[in-house]
């Protein structure tokens, strides 16, 4: 699949900051995507809008072509998750499902994008491309994960997983192109682990990213049965994280721990910039 010629978005959301809060100013979606209410529930970040993305099908099928686009305008703050882990079902020989996600994070915006993992069933084939276009003074945490499941308990695996992550600054060439391709993998390849994930963390230049990388490593080291690594991205623009575990719960714990650390860092930076601007808000629906 060419990242330069994606399918038209079946989900297209744009977010803006108005009156001290983030709201949706473009809301377009088609089958299988479903979007209901979004919420302001964070007392420490009353501007943060939480979005729970749902799908009518609850799964990705063999020849699906799904493109999503999320655009955060200047100063917007958004948290995106999904209703639950998404099953990726068998694809006919020669076919594969294709999914593209475009994330655009403008100056001063912050994005916490943590969809639930993919569950790859026997003979599943999935090609996914995630593009993160992030301004230099924006904050973004973007995660991706998968696990494997054979309902018959015979240890059968998926057929193909082709995953690409592209990170760039606005209107610039990519800073990072990270690709993983697994075709007809054998059980021995995974060394007893069945849940795998990665994350990209982008922070403004005011932060010491090398020091934060060490904090990420220390945070993840406290989670039992989780193999984790973190490294600086090219030009030290951010941090790349890899996770492997025997079960999804350990992977989720890792992502949650990183998100909590990012939240702590971001709130601290905001308090330092505007110590008198502390505000609270009652949870409301948007």
Curated annotation (Swiss-Prot):
Required for maturation of urease via the functional incorporation of the urease nickel metallocenter. PANTHER family: UREASE ACCESSORY PROTEIN D (PTHR33643:SF1). The gene is ureD2. The keyword Cytoplasm applies. It comes from Bradyrhizobium sp. (strain BTAi1 / ATCC BAA-1182). Belongs to the UreD family. The keyword Ribonucleoprotein does not apply. This is Urease accessory protein UreD 2. It is found in: Cytoplasm. Keywords: Chaperone, Cytoplasm, Nickel insertion. One of its GO terms (cellular component) is cytoplasm. Its main location: cytoplasm.
């Amino acid at each position: 699949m060419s990242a330069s010629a994606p399918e038209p978005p079946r989900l297209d959301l744009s977010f803006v900051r108005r009156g001290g809060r983030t709201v949706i100013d473009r809301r377009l979606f088609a089958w299988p995507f479903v979007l209901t209410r979004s919420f302001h529930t964070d007392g420490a970040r009353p501007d943060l809008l939480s979005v729970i993305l749902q799908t009518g099908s609850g799964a990705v099928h063999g020849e699906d072509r799904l493109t999503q686009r999320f655009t955060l305008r200047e100063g917007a703050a958004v948290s995106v998750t999904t209703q639950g882990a998404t099953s990726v079902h068998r694809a006919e020989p020669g076919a594969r499902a294709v999914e593209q996600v475009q994330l655009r994070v403008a100056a001063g915006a912050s994005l916490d994008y943590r969809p639930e993992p993919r569950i790859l069933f026997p003979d599943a084939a999935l090609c996914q491309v995630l593009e993160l276009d992030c301004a230099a003074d924006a904050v973004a945490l973007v995660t991706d994960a998968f696990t494997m499941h054979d309902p018959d308990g015979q240890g059968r695996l998926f057929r193909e997983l082709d995953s690409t992550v592209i990170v760039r600054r606005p209107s610039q060439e990519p800073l990072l192109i990270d690709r993983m391709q697994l075709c007809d993998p054998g059980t021995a390849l995974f060394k007893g682990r069945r849940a795998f994930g990665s994350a990209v963390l982008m922070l403004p230049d005011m932060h010491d990213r090398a020091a934060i990388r060490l904090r990420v490593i220390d945070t993840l080291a406290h989670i039992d049965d989780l193999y984790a690594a973190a490294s600086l991205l090219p030009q030290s623009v951010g941090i790349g994280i890899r996770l492997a575990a025997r079960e999804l719960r350990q992977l989720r714990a890792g992502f949650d721990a990183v998100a909590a650390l990012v939240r702590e860092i971001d709130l601290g930076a905001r308090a330092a910039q505007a110590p008198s601007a502390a505000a609270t808000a009652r949870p409301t629906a948007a």
